[in-house]
A protein has these predicted regions:
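TPR/TPR-like (Sel1-like) alpha-helical repeat modules
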Residues: 51, 99, 107-134, 159-167
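Terminal, low-structured helical/coil segments at or just beyond the last alpha-helical repeat
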Residues: 132-212
């Protein structure tokens, strides 16, 4: 009887865990849609709810991001720099290679007055994102990698910004604006690459079906 009860309890725990993860994913998708159209308050609410449901939730395949990166980035976009810093540091404590989180941590620090550490984090985030895009487009060039940053627009922008950081006179307003553009552009690229891959597969499938 004890063994049976234990099995039932375990099954219930697994079921509830799966439900929480599914609900978290639904909130993340809604949050991303809100975030990408600039509805930052709504995005923050969705991401925060997802973190409450499943604090270990990770989104994505090619560019994996934990939920605290999303909470922190949306908090930054609402101007809540204290919440942003806490969440972004938590994201990086879970995975130090969360380069979008690092980029936004740098932005948060810079806009909170700590430009010295801020520029280091921005630079580190940019370098990490560049390396990730290079890896995705090279290692997976025969699969989903061929749909990422196809014109090299993101990587070229990163190279220009890194050169600006290394220059003598750093234009902070431009760096912050460019970094915010980069953060959103990379997030958009997730959807664009997925869309292009899906359309390509549909064309291939349609072509095969039409063959005699």
């Amino acid at each position: 009887m004890k063994a049976l009860n234990s099995m039932v309890f375990f099954a219930v725990v697994v079921f509830l865990s799966g439900c929480a993860s599914f609900q978290a994913g639904t909130n993340v998708e809604a949050g991303r849609k809100a975030f990408l159209i600039g509805n930052n308050e709504a995005a923050f609410g969705y991401f925060q709810r997802a973190a409450e449901l499943d604090p270990t939730y990770v989104y994505g395949v090619a560019l994996r991001q934990n939920i605290w990166s999303y909470v922190g980035r949306s908090a930054y976009s609402t101007g809540n720099f204290s919440q942003a810093r806490n969440s972004l540091e938590k994201s990086l404590s879970i995975n130090k290679e969360e380069d979008l989180a690092r980029l936004y941590l740098g932005l948060t620090l810079a806009r909170s007055g700590d430009r010295q550490q801020g520029v280091k984090e921005i630079q580190g985030g940019m370098k990490g994102l560049y390396d990730q895009l290079e890896y995705i487009t090279q290692a997976y060039r025969y699969s989903y990698g061929q749909y990422w940053d196809t014109r090299g627009e993101i990587r070229s922008a990163i190279q220009r910004d890194l050169a600006m950081i290394d220059g003598k006179d750093l234009d902070w307003q431009k760096l912050i604006s460019n970094s915010e553009w980069l953060g959103r552009k990379v997030e958009e690229e997730i959807d664009l690459a997925r869309r292009d891959e899906r359309e390509d597969r549909l064309r291939d499938s349609s072509g095969r079906d039409s063959q005699p």
